[in-house]
Amino acid sequence: MQHEVNIIVAVSEALKFRKQKPLARHEEILEHINSLIRQQRDENTKLGMIVATNRALDFLDKNPEMNDKTALQHVMANLPEILASASGE
């Protein structure tokens, strides 16, 4: 459960940063949340944070009419798949 919470926190922070700097590239946004990622000891959580953030950003890029809440819901709905891909299953 804590893995999921940490992933959602990272995605939320990334979306907040994107709202402040709408022209920021994905790399800049990931760099912004890098401190959150580095705080984690579990490699799967770190990878999950990166994958989930990229999924949320890609979702918003492909669906510009959607808002951050919808992107976060999209990530949450796909969290089992994200965690599985992060753990290499």
PLM segments and residue spans:
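Intrinsic-disorder/low-complexity detector
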Residues: M1-E89
